[in-house]
Regions:
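Pro/Ala/Gly-rich low-complexity, hydrophilic intrinsically disordered segments
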Residues: 59-85, 89, 325-331, 335
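Positions within the helices of HEAT/ARM-like alpha-solenoid repeats
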Residues: 5-10, 45-50
Length: 336
């Protein structure tokens, strides 16, 4: 795996070592591989192989060093790698979405017909969190919350029973406290007490703002597929899916800690299953809103990157969210 130059291919090789626990290898081999994976986990510029290294090391019981949360030089760092860790400990992964149409629906709807409309005219740079927002992270914003299902005391399960307004309020709270330098003009949403389900409708102007927000359906679908055209991001096998997805086939009626299964090729976890995630669509005629990715209660066939419509004003045991933000490139080529 050391000689592989493609980070996605290197990720696959790393994950293939996971079943071979240290007891099944010689002490020298175990030490050598562990040291290499620790190096990738700490400093790889690619979230693909970094995520695989962290996943395998956790499975081997190796304590991982917490990554730096100093975001004061994020733009400079982004020129060297495709991820950073914000103050809340959330890893953000930078992706570049091809855009095949003009107008806000090109970045909101995530419709397959837009992908077949012709050659791409531009790209949209954005970042999406590698994991769903955990209960611990949401509780930093809200002193208490009526989560459903009794989970572990460390609150590592994804936040659930979340409705869309709570998710947007968290994004606004995070943006207000971020050292990434957001001013009011950068905010996608108004003050927290003014956010309603109406703010799930995004304009082009709002999408150009760089504060934290929910992903659009197009962004979510692109991050989920991770460059594949198969039913699930890992391929077509519903048996192998259980290594990547918390669903009825393995959940036993419970959620999994965020990021505890295998990541997709771009280093993003739990895009299939665990909790369904609120996204920014245009609302349907019924006033319902988009949830993506299936959840812990459904069979594998319902964990694909499909869109489900539910009332945005209600939460369920299977509804949660992850965060995103637009990335801009300055005239000098710097990202911000």
């Amino acid at each position: 795996m050391r000689h592989e130059t493609d980070p996605v291919a290197r990720q696959a090789l790393i994950l293939a070592t996971d079943p071979f626990r240290s007891g099944q290898r010689t002490a020298d081999d175990a030490s050598d591989v562990t040291g290499y994976l620790q190096q990738l986990a700490a400093s790889s510029p690619h979230q693909s192989d970094r995520s695989a290294a962290r996943t395998v090391l956790r499975g081997w019981g190796v304590e991982l060093k917490a990554p730096s949360r100093d975001v004061s030089e994020v733009p400079q760092r982004l020129a060297q790698r495709n991820w950073w860790v914000n103050e809340q400990g959330i890893t953000m992964v930078i992706l570049e979405l091809p855009v095949y149409a003009s107008g806000p629906q090109a970045l909101v709807a995530g419709r397959e017909e837009e992908a077949s409309a012709g050659p791409k005219s531009r790209t949209h740079l954005f970042a999406i969190s590698s994991t769903e927002v955990s209960r611990e992270q949401l509780l930093r914003c809200q002193q208490s919350f009526p989560f459903l299902l009794e989970g572990p005391e460390d609150h590592t399960w994804p936040a659930n029973n979340v409705f869309s307004v709570v998710a947007m309020q968290y994004c606004r709270w995070l943006s207000e406290r971020s050292a990434e330098g957001f001013d009011e003009v950068d905010m996608c949403y108004p003050e927290r007490n003014r956010i309603t389900t109406d703010h799930l409708q995004l304009s082009d102007e709002q999408l150009r703002k760089t504060s934290y927000r929910l992903p659009t359906e197009a962004e979510w679908e692109y991050a989920c597929s991770s460059g594949t055209a198969t039913p699930w991001s890992h391929g077509s096998s519903d048996v192998e899916l259980l290594e990547f997805c918390c669903c009825a086939g393995n959940s036993r009626g419970k959620l999994f800690p965020v990021g505890s299964l295998y990541p997709n090729a771009w280093g993003i976890y739990d895009m299939h299953g665990n909790v369904a995630e609120w996204c920014h669509p245009a609302p349907s005629a019924t006033g319902n809103y988009a949830l993506r990715g299936g959840n812990y209660t459904v069979p594998t066939s319902r964990t694909k990157s499909r869109s489900l419509n539910y009332p945005g004003s209600k939460g369920y045991s299977f509804t949660g969210f992850r965060i995103a933000r637009t990335i801009l490139r300055t005239d000098s080529g710097e990202l911000k």
